[in-house]
């Protein structure tokens, strides 16, 4: 059993080092497509929970990951690309990589939005210093959920499933990357 855990952790470390490099660039040819997907995700989340409007109006900035793909069998990984807005203007692109270990199996895609309460938190994200286990703090988008949501250390996280199914009782973290436009 110890050997399996060691291998799982080693795999998680390797994936954690390699996956962020896959989404490291802001590709101007794909920029319009990424922005369109992000705007579609925002519209879908606002339809699902109109109370999200307050976060869009009052946050300093936010990042929208329209499609994060996640797959797992004991060791899990997820990766997605997003679009970053600061003070209402598109600032650049982002990537998210997640690694988890535990009882989990399946595959799914979902959308995720991170709202930054203030400039300090937004700057941490842009500098690559924002890393946390958001799955515990994330709010599932459904009617009225955002009304009771709040910032945790300057960040509010909302997720909405789009495709697939997964059984997940794991622990892990997220690492974010930012590329200015």
Predicted regions and their residues:
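Small-residue-enriched, tightly packed secondary-structure blocks
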Residues: 24-181
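Bacterial N-terminal signal peptides that target proteins for export
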Residues: 1-9
């Amino acid at each position: 059993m110890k050997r399996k855990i060691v291998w799982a952790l080693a795999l998680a470390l390797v994936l954690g080092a390699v996956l962020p490099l896959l989404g490291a660039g802001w590709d101007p040819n794909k920029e319009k497509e990424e922005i369109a997907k992000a705007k579609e995700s925002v519209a879908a989340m606002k339809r699902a929970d109109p109370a999200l409007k307050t976060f869009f109006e009052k946050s300093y900035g936010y990042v929208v990951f329209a499609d994060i793909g996640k797959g797992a069998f004991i060791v899990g990984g997820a990766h997605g690309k997003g679009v970053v807005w600061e003070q209402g203007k598109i600032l650049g692109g982002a990537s998210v990589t997640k690694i988890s270990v535990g009882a989990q199996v399946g595959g799914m895609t979902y959308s995720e939005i991170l709202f930054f309460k203030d400039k300090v938190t937004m700057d941490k994200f842009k500098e690559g210093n924002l890393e946390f286990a958001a799955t515990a703090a994330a709010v599932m988008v459904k009617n009225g959920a955002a009304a009771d949501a709040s910032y945790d250390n300057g960040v509010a996280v909302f997720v909405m499933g789009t495709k697939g199914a997964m059984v997940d009782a794991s622990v892990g973290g997220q690492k974010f990357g930012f590329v200015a436009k």
